[in-house]
Curated annotation (Swiss-Prot):
Pro residues composition-biased segments: 241-253
GO biological process, alphabetically ordered: clathrin-dependent endocytosis; intracellular protein transport
Keywords: Coated pit, Coiled coil, Cytoplasmic vesicle, Membrane
Organism listed in the record: Arabidopsis thaliana
Positions with biased composition (Polar residues): 29-47, 61-73
Name of the featured protein: Clathrin light chain 1
Length: 338
């Protein structure tokens, strides 16, 4: 059996008269063949002429737009420059898409200059920042050194001042405790001003606008009474329950014995003097001739010692009366004689 590849064609079943124009391949000559038009990237289309055997229709012209391929323009502009695939090769490269590097350098001159200036500016800025950073670090180190030196100096000064204040405080406390049992009011007056700052400090945290109840007034002011509530409170507290350091020290045993003997002698002496004074008063009353008040004598009966003193005073008064009588008589007699 003959095949198409072998070049054997089947016999014609119709007469040559049925096709006047085309009787066979022998009727065509090389001069009568129509010219073929090739266009890069195009697809062949049937326009009444047989398609070109070159490339199975690729590159053939398609004047009839009704049978043209819709992808023809896209194939022609495959590489973006309208060249399409050049020559007989399909999808052939037409060169690099980007332009020549030399042309790029010429086109980017301003940008390259800007980048160069920007790089210089950034380098200068970074250099200034480093210098500023080093300067700040140096100043910080100097400040830290000066701060620590000042702090150490302040600590030493505070230590010295605190030691002196502590010594003064203990000296004042010792002096206060020694003299507090002698002058209570002076001790109270010294305690009140010390407690006022503490009261103000405690109340200042809660309500700073509220004034303390105790106001220290230096000296009397007319029309403004001094608040003595705190003074009375401390006085009553010290009077009812005095602390041990305010109690008077007890006297030694020997001094107490001597004091007791002296007290007994003093009482005896004062009693004797009082009795003598009483006796002298009674004698004076009798001497003047004024009798003693009976009511007083009844209410205050004299003691035996007093009676004895009165009895001894009476003879003296009588004797003095008798001695005065002769003097008066002699004076009267002298006048009569004259």
């Amino acid at each position: 059996m003959a095949t198409f590849d072998d070049g054997d064609f089947p016999a014609q079943t119709h007469s040559p008269s049925e096709h006047e124009d085309f009787g066979g391949y022998d009727n065509f000559s090389e001069a009568q063949q129509p010219p073929t038009q090739h266009q890069s990237g195009g697809f062949s289309s049937f326009n009444g002429d047989p398609a070109s055997p070159n490339g199975y229709g690729f590159g053939a012209s398609s004047p009839n737009h009704d049978f043209s391929s819709p992808f023809e323009s896209s194939v022609n502009d495959a590489n973006g420059n309208g060249g399409g695939s050049g020559g007989d090769a399909i999808f052939a490269s037409d060169g690099p898409i980007l332009p020549d590097p030399n042309e790029m350098r010429e086109e980017g001159f301003q940008r390259r200059e800007w980048r160069r200036l920007n790089t210089i500016h950034l380098e200068e800025k970074e250099k200034k920042e480093k210098e500023m950073r080093n300067q700040i670090i140096t100043e910080a180190e100097d400040f830290k050194k000066a701060f620590y030196e000042k702090r150490d100096k302040t600590i030493e000064t505070n230590k010295t001042d605190n030691r002196e204040k502590e010594k003064l405080y203990w000296a004042n406390q010792e002096k206060f405790h020694k003299e507090v049992d002698k002058h209570y009011w002076k001790a109270i007056a010294e305690l009140i001003p010390r407690e006022v700052p503490n009261i103000e400090k405690k109340r200042g945290k809660k309500d700073p606008d509220k004034k303390p109840s105790v106001n220290v007034i230096q000296g009397p002011k007319p029309g403004k009474p001094t608040d003595l509530g705190r003074m009375r409170q401390i006085f009553l507290k010290l009077k009812t329950n005095p602390p041990p350091h305010m109690m008077p020290p007890p006297p030694p045993a020997k001094d107490a014995k001597d004091g007791k003997d002296a007290k007994d002698g003093k009482d005896a002496k004062t009693g004797k003097d009082g009795k003598d004074a009483k006796g002298g008063k009674d004698a004076k009353d009798l001497k003047d001739g004024k009798p003693a008040d009976p009511k007083v004598t009844e209410e205050k009966r004299p003691s035996p010692a007093k009676d004895a003193s009165v009895e001894t005073a009476k003879p003296d008064a009588a004797a003095s009366g008798e001695g005065e009588k002769p003097v008066a008589v002699t004076e009267a007699e002298g006048t009569k004689a004259e």
